[in-house]
A protein has these predicted regions:
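Short acidic alpha-helix initiation/capping motifs at coil-to-helix transition points
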Residues: 65-67, 100-104, 144-150
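Glycine- and Gly-Pro-enriched alpha-helical subdomains that act as flexible
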Residues: 111-114, 124
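Strongly charged, low-complexity linkers/loops
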Residues: 124-155
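A general alpha-helix detector
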Residues: 70-74, 85, 106-109, 149-155
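Structure-specific DNA junction-binding interface
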Residues: 1-77
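Amphipathic, charged-and-aliphatic alpha-helical interface segments
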Residues: 58-63, 83-102, 123-136
Length: 155
């Protein structure tokens, strides 16, 4: 529904940022690592978003770039990992470490993320190894590779 929100970063908490745009202040939930990436209060910011809607609540989740949003959405595809858990995982591991651990099946690294035990790490690897849809993947030749999601269509 919302791809991104640009505006003035008007505040930060431990798990969210506030972005003021055209007289509306948006509360956007972000990972702890994204808090530092998004800049300082009072500055212009662009936050890529994903809207979570249930019958009893709506939450807007934010990311400093589209690649992190894509990784977040991949994590939410894992059984037992909802949006809040995915954000916690991304607070404990940066996106490159997380992607590497998933691709290599590194359970020990995944368990360093908050709330991830051995079973959850195994589920994450089983569900996502070789299937990450990150838009910014680059092949060893320096060319952008085709997203795994669409690779079957191309070949």
């Amino acid at each position: 529904m919302f791809n991104s929100i640009s505006g003035i970063l008007s505040g930060k908490t431990t798990d969210s940022v506030y972005v003021e745009n055209s007289g509306i202040e948006w509360e956007i939930f972000v990972s702890a690592l994204a808090l530092d990436t998004l800049g300082t209060v009072g500055k212009e910011v662009k936050v890529y978003t994903w809207l979570y809607h249930r019958e009893d609540q709506m939450r807007l989740f934010g990311f400093p770039n589209q690649a992190e949003r894509s990784l977040f959405l991949d994590l939410t595809k894992v059984e037992g990992v909802g949006p809040r858990q995915a954000l916690k995982i991304m607070s404990g591991l940066n996106s490159s470490s997380l992607e590497k651990a998933l691709e290599e099946g590194d359970i020990d690294t995944l368990q360093k993320a908050p709330g991830v035990g051995k079973k959850t790490a195994q589920k994450m690897i089983l569900a996502l190894k070789g299937k990450l849809t990150n838009l910014n993947k680059v092949s060893s030749k320096g060319q952008a590779s085709v997203s795994c999601e669409y690779e079957d269509i191309v070949t």
